[in-house]
């Protein structure tokens, strides 16, 4: 049974769905009572993909969870966010983060100290939206940036993705919200405490920092199929530099096979407990119970990230099967 509390849905840019179908999913989520729909930027452009979601909906919040800040200058991010917030009538939320350094290097992007870059990036976005004279930092420097139309909300919410303690503390200090990911409820509770403490230290009201947590969700009545689906997504995350600290397991053979392109072999070597730690899997009752654990850990908005079951993305099933207020 899912409670009537806030719930979000994430649609992956690499789901293979045409943008129009993503919009249809967003409308279905809105009709089912979801509070927010996000685009997760994998290989596509999350900000561009927010357009069809906004066009298809009328009340649900739409945002990115997340967009890779390194891919776009902060002035461009601010201009795009202002347009999306205007188009949505004030429903847009900008979720930012950094892909891992190896991926950004692959894209030919310059490397900067992550904390400094994120803090300055947010400052530039806010300066542009507020019409301030400019910003001068160690990485970014801008003059006043004109916009064609005044922002619908000069203070539109900016959320930061954070995994480690330093980025969590930065989010608590400067962001409107934090986006957690790849965490067990226990790890999420620790992250919540870090964010709240940092907000208080900065003289902010801790509860004003929204805690969003992406919950990978593999929904299937066949428990074994759901467990397989949960394990199948681990190799992709095993290559993330933070994997050892996130999963508490070296995952050496999984990483070796994944780097060699043997994804099937990598999946076979995934310890089930690693997948269990951050994936809600099983039938609606099992997934719903797991999501409630995140709420008890202090998460304000769990965001369901549907995981393929035997190769098929179960968006429609997740939207209806785990809808807010639905009993199972």
Language model feature labels by segment:
Residues 1-328:
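Active-site-adjacent structural elements that line small-molecule/cofactor binding pockets in enzymes
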